């Protein structure tokens, strides 16, 4: 195995060097960890609903939240949303998502321009023909005036058609023309880079610019961001647009972003999931955290390992216990982060039979091996690799939950610090 291969799989992974950008105090790029962000789907003019969803997203772990600013009523609501969030103790940076009339909204609502931590600009619809550069410049000048960063967010569904047509015509004149897909990828990259260069010419510093180039296909996303990473040192926002619902959206986003992150590309991510009707918007935050944690980039919540089950595990007790422990951890993490510093590194194992159960449980900080089919109805518990107890009877689940809570208190709690 070559030294280059060893380096590629080492930890930490080699990270592309980008220019760091402060978004309301959250650093994106540079040497900062990859940041998790999300977006509301409420009507921003509805202050109560928007505040409630931002709070839920922030509690779930979103470090930046984007909101739609599409009309006067939405822009007027932004300062109220910001004020309400601060009163509730949620000082999460808000990003204004602007399309078509962002230049006008920012000019007409200075309190909105001030309250937002970042402006998102789409070069494909900021203006058309002779108005495009002027309206783009207006937003950039607002960012300079209020000392705000911008994300220049190209999207293949609203790609600058003039640029695409120019590149298509130029490609046809070549002796060996590229495919239409390759030309589209190049147009997306050029749209982002041309816009970034224009913003810098107007006077916006590179430490105020984040780029994104979103498409809906995995291979396109990998190609486009690889090209951007090679041709720029701007901070990059990763995201697969129109990823879809449920498992499909999770798999597509994880496949694309996992490859890019492994290559050191990406400074902030958003998993754009289509929620089920009545579904939980915070799911996208959880998936983003799990992607980064699974790849070893960050730690957000304790890991609960559980076996998949087989013919030896006809009982559902281990599945129910694993789910209960995971839900309990998620529910308590906002408090635990404050009360138990370092608890994110905890690992818990809930196993279903004797084959791998004891071994897996020993590798976790605290683990339990529940009895499988035909096995003695007892469950050994391991703490820091050593067997410390054997649980029996109908209260195994409740007893183990208490042991987990006691372990967290003893290892991460204030009493441990005083004793040390």
UniProtKB/Swiss-Prot annotation:
Matching entries from Pfam families are given as: GcpE
The superkingdom of the source organism is Bacteria
Q: Which pathway does it operate in?
A: Isoprenoid biosynthesis; isopentenyl diphosphate biosynthesis via DXP pathway; isopentenyl diphosphate from 1-deoxy-D-xylulose 5-phosphate: step 5/6
Q: Which UniProt keywords apply?
A: 4Fe-4S, Iron, Iron-sulfur, Isoprene biosynthesis, Metal-binding, Oxidoreductase
Gene Ontology biological process terms, A to Z = isopentenyl diphosphate biosynthetic process, methylerythritol 4-phosphate pathway; terpenoid biosynthetic process
Its needed co-factors are: [4Fe-4S] cluster
The entry's [4Fe-4S] cluster-binding residues are 307, 310, 353, 360
Q: Per the annotation, how and in what number is the cofactor bound?
A: Binds 1 [4Fe-4S] cluster.
Give an example GO molecular function: 4-hydroxy-3-methylbut-2-enyl-diphosphate synthase activity (flavodoxin)
Catalysis performed (reactions): (2E)-4-hydroxy-3-methylbut-2-enyl diphosphate + oxidized [flavodoxin] + H2O + 2 H(+) = 2-C-methyl-D-erythritol 2,4-cyclic diphosphate + reduced [flavodoxin]
| EC number(s) recorded for this UniProt protein | 1.17.7.3
Q: Per its database record, what is this protein's job?
A: Converts 2C-methyl-D-erythritol 2,4-cyclodiphosphate (ME-2,4cPP) into 1-hydroxy-2-methyl-2-(E)-butenyl 4-diphosphate.
Family designation: Belongs to the IspG family.
HAMAP family under this entry? Answer: IspG
**Name of the molecule in the record:** 4-hydroxy-3-methylbut-2-en-1-yl diphosphate synthase (flavodoxin)
**Species classification:** Bacteria, Pseudomonadati, Pseudomonadota, Alphaproteobacteria, Hyphomicrobiales
Gene that codes for this? ispG
């Amino acid at each position: 195995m070559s030294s280059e291969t060893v380096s590629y799989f080492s930890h930490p992974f080699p990270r592309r060097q980008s220019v760091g950008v402060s978004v309301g105090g959250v650093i994106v790029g540079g040497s900062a960890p990859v940041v998790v962000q999300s977006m509301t789907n409420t009507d921003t003019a509805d202050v109560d609903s928007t505040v409630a969803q931002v709070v839920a997203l922030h509690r779930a772990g979103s470090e930046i939240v984007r909101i739609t600013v599409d009309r006067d009523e939405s822009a007027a609501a932004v300062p109220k949303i910001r004020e309400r969030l601060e009163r509730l103790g949620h000082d999460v940076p808000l990003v204004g998502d602007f399309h078509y009339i962002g230049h006008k909204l920012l000019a007409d609502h200075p309190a909105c321009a001030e309250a937002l931590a970042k402006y998102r600009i789409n070069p494909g619809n900021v203006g058309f023909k002779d108005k495009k550069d002027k309206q783009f410049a207006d937003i950039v000048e607002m960012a300079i005036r209020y000392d705000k960063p911008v994300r220049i967010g190209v999207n293949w569904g609203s790609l600058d058609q003039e640029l695409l047509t120019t590149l298509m015509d130029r490609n046809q004149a070549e002796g060996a023309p590229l495919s239409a897909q390759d030309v589209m990828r190049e147009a997306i990259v050029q749209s982002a880079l041309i816009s970034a260069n224009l913003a810098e010419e107007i006077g916006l510093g590179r430490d105020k610019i984040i780029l994104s180039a979103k498409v809906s296909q995995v291979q396109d996303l990998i190609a486009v961001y690889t090209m951007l990473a090679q041709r720029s040192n701007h901070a990059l926002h990763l995201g697969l647009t129109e990823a879809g619902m449920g498992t499909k959206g999770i798999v597509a986003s994880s496949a694309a972003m996992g490859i890019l992150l492994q290559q050191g590309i990406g400074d902030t991510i958003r998993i754009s999931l289509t929620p089920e009707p009545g579904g939980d918007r915070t799911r996208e935050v959880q998936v983003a955290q799990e992607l980064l944690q699974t790849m070893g980039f960050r730690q957000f919540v304790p890991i609960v390992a559980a076996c998949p089950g087989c013919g030896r595990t006809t009982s559902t007790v281990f599945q129910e216990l694993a789910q209960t422990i995971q839900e309990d951890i998620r529910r308590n993490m906002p408090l635990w982060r404050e009360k138990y510093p370092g608890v994110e590194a905890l690992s818990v194992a809930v196993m279903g039979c004797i084959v791998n159960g004891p071994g897996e449980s020993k590798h976790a900080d605290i683990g339990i091996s529940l009895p499988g089919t035909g096995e003695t109805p007892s469950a050994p518990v391991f703490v820091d690799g050593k067997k410390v107890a054997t649980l029996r009877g109908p209260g195994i689940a409740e007893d183990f939950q208490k042991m987990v809570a006691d372990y967290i208190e003893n290892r991460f709690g204030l009493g441990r610090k005083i004793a040390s």
